[in-house]
Structures are given as structure tokens and as C-alpha cells.
Regions:
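Glycine-rich phosphate-binding active-site loops on the catalytic face of alpha/beta enzymes
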Residues: 103, 151-168
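Glycine-rich beta-to-alpha transition loops that act as phosphate-gripper elements at the mouths
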Residues: 74-78, 131-140, 159-161
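Alpha/beta enzyme core
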Residues: 18-28, 58-108, 116-125
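Hydrophobic faces of well-ordered beta-strands that scaffold small-molecule active sites
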Residues: 1-5, 28, 70-74, 101, ...
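Active-site-adjacent beta->alpha loops and helix N-cap segments on the catalytic face
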Residues: 37-58, 108-119
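Conserved small/polar residues in nucleotide/adenosyl-binding loops
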Residues: 190-194
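Catalytic cores of alpha/beta
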Residues: 13-19, 82-87, 136-153
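Glycine-rich, positively charged N-terminal anion/phosphate-binding segment
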Residues: 1-23
Length: 194
């Protein structure tokens, strides 16, 4: 389990990191990807991506916590996909264990299509282990992304598991289950939980 924080200022970053670190956690994920208007409207989550100076200020305290591994989840930007390109140089200077980049803007939320061209621009410049996020719903989707971006460290499945709960099992076993197999596995799982 890796806790996630959603800070809006350096002080809030410290407060949240102290609280989570005080519970013994040594890995913390920083959320700059939440697209929901009530969060983004407060310049948090993906809403902060419009403000590079705020991003720099919020992430600066990473250096104060050498005992904690920080990772970052983010989107291409809030309004347009070029916003992440303004941040990549800053992010490359920070001590991050990984970055998970959702290939949509915050304004898109989960609508429209991921922008793979914009993702590629970030992918080519990012010096941290990078993970792809966005519309991974099948084994074929995973293969296509890993083929196009061979230096990725992996993909985040996220919501894809809601529509295809066996997706991780399919990926691990490198096989796509037939509908009958899906039903059989689901029934077996249901009996285990009963």
C-alpha cells in the first residue's frame, strides 16, 4: 500500500508527509492528476499543472525527506497537453522513484482519447522511470502501449480493471480469456469469497 497525498502548498505537503510518514510509510505518491473540478479549482491535482511556479514550490520539500521515496501521478496538463512539457525539466531535477502520466488533460477528465503524441514528447525527455496511464482496458491495449513506448517501466491499469477484472491476470499469463473462461474464473472467485 502506497498512500497518496494531494497538496496545494509546500506547507500542506509537509503536513501531509509528516502525517503519513508518522504512520511508518516510506513511500508516498503525489497526486497532480486528479481532474475533478472541486479539486482542480483549488489549484490541486491536475488543476495545479497550469501553474509551474506553484508546482515547483509544492514539490520543493521532497528534498527535506530523504527517508521517503516519492512518486508522482500526473496528467499532460489541465487545459492543453503542452503543459507537461513546461514541467519536465523541473521534474527531472527532483528525487522521484517514478512518474505515472495519464495521457489526457484534466479538462478532458476521462472523455475523448488519450493523446499519445503528447505522451511521446514527455516520454522522450523524462529521466525518471515512467508509467503510462489512460484507457488500458485489454491485453491488446497493454501490448500496443509497451510496443510503442518500449522504455516504459509499465502501465497503470486503474479503471480498466472495472471493465475487465481479469486484465492483470491476462497480462501476467500473456493470454486473453474467452468469455466462458472469464465466467468460470469469476464463479470460482465468488465461491472463494463466500
Amino acid at each position: 500500500l502506497i498512500p497518496q497525498i494531494l497538496p496545494g502548498s509546500a506547507d500542506e505537503f509537509r503536513l501531509l508527509t509528516d502525517a503519513v510518514g508518522g504512520k511508518g510509510y516510506r513511500q508516498i505518491d503525489i497526486n497532480l492528476g486528479c481532474p475533478f473540478p472541486m479539486i482542480a479549482g483549488k489549484h490541486k491535482g491536475a488543476g495545479m499543472l497550469l501553474y509551474p511556479a506553484q508546482v515547483a514550490e509544492v514539490l520543493a520539500p521532497i528534498a527535506e525527506y530523504p527517508e521517503i521515496q516519492f512518486s508522482l501521478k500526473m496528467r499532460l496538463g489541465w487545459e492543453n497537453a503542452s503543459e507537461c512539457m513546461v514541467l519536465v525539466e523541473l521534474l527531472n531535477t527532483l528525487r522521484l522513484s517514478r512518474i505515472a502520466l495519464h495521457a489526457r488533460t484534466g479538462k478532458q477528465q476521462y472523455k475523448g482519447h488519450p493523446d499519445l503524441e503528447a505522451f511521446q514528447g514527455f516520454y522522450e525527455l523524462c529521466q525518471h522511470p515512467l508509467y503510462y496511464n489512460g484507457d488500458i482496458e485489454s491485453l491488446s491495449d497493454i501490448r500496443q502501449i509497451l510496443t510503442r513506448f518500449p522504455l516504459l517501466k509499465g502501465v497503470f491499469i486503474g479503471r480498466g480493471l472495472l471493465s475487465s477484472p481479469l486484465l492483470a491476470k491476462e497480462f501476467k499469463g500473456n493470454e486473453t480469456f474467452l468469455p466462458e473462461q472469464r465466467m468460470s474464473i469469476s464463479v470460482s472467485y465468488t465461491h472463494l469469497r463466500a
